[in-house]
Structures are given as C-alpha cells and as structure tokens.
C-alpha cells in the first residue's frame, strides 16, 4: 500500500518524496498500472492467463517498441469481471477485453485480488504472476516499480513548476 499512497500523492501534486518498499506481486502490479486499460485477455481457467495492459505513459519509458505490458498468471483459478451496472459477471475473456476497463486500484481479499476499474471490478486468483513487454522481454516487478516511481517524481516536479504533462 505504501507505493499506492505515494503514487497517489505524487499524482495529486502533494509534496513529499516517493518511497518504494517491496510489496507482494498482488495487488502491487495492478496498483502500478493505475490508469492502464485491460485491452485483451487470453488463456483458460484453470490454467495460465495473459492480461494485456495498455498504459502509454509507462510503456513509452522502455526502449523496446510496443504498446502493452503482459501480465502472466500461471495456475490461475479465477478471473471474472463484474460491471457496476451488470447482473452477471463476465467470464468470457473476449468480452472482458471489449469492455476495455481502466484500472484504478486493487486490494487483496483472502486469496482473491480485487481490481477496481472505471466500469467494474475484476477478481482474480493466481499463485503468482510475471510481467513482460509485448516484445517478449521479462520485466521484474522491481524494475517496473522503479520506472513508475521515476515517472511520478518527474510528474510531481513538473506540476510544482506549473508545467504538468
């Protein structure tokens, strides 16, 4: 949660340094992808699921060309999406990608990671996860957190000077 609060403070232009402590993969990965969109989901339950996240302001900070981060969820036993105005959860991966939900925040509820989005809540349960660029290069969570922290520090400095992006 420390990273989430620091990123939110920086986004709001609040003074103070951004501190980074290692957090578990879930829910940290979804918190760092704040404002990113789930563009596509592939795989099967139970099994390995790949979630394609488009988040331009972070992706462009990597030298390799591409548009997405791919979050791989091995041994995934649950992935569903409940629209705020829907009755039944969406479990069809193509339909979930069609909604293109934007990630806001995430929290753990037992073994389930709840990812709160602009139009609903995605719930997932997986033993672990990994991140790679759409070029195939693996990105350790620590590297992604470092890149995100640098982005928000720069954003905060620009906003203090009256020059937000």
Residues covered by each model-derived region:
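Surface-exposed, interaction-prone regions used to assemble/regulate multi-protein complexes
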Residues: 2-165
């Amino acid at each position: 949660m420390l990273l989430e609060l620091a990123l939110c403070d920086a986004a709001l232009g609040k003074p103070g340094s951004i501190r980074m402590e290692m957090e578990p993969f879930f829910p940290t990965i979804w918190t760092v992808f704040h404002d990113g969109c789930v563009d596509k989901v592939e795989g099967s339950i139970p099994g390995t699921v790949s979630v394609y996240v488009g988040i331009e302001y972070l992706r462009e900070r990597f030298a390799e060309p591409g548009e997405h981060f791919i979050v791989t969820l091995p041994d995934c036993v649950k992935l569903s999406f409940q629209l705020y105005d829907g009755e039944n959860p969406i479990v069809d991966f193509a339909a979930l990608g069609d909604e293109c939900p934007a990630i806001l925040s995430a929290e753990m509820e037992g073994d389930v990671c709840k990812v709160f989005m602009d139009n609903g809540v995605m719930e997932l349960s997986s033993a672990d996860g990994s991140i790679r660029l759409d070029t195939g290069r693996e990105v350790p969570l620590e590297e992604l957190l470092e890149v995100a922290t640098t982005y928000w520090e720069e954003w905060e400095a620009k906003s203090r000077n009256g020059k937000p992006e």
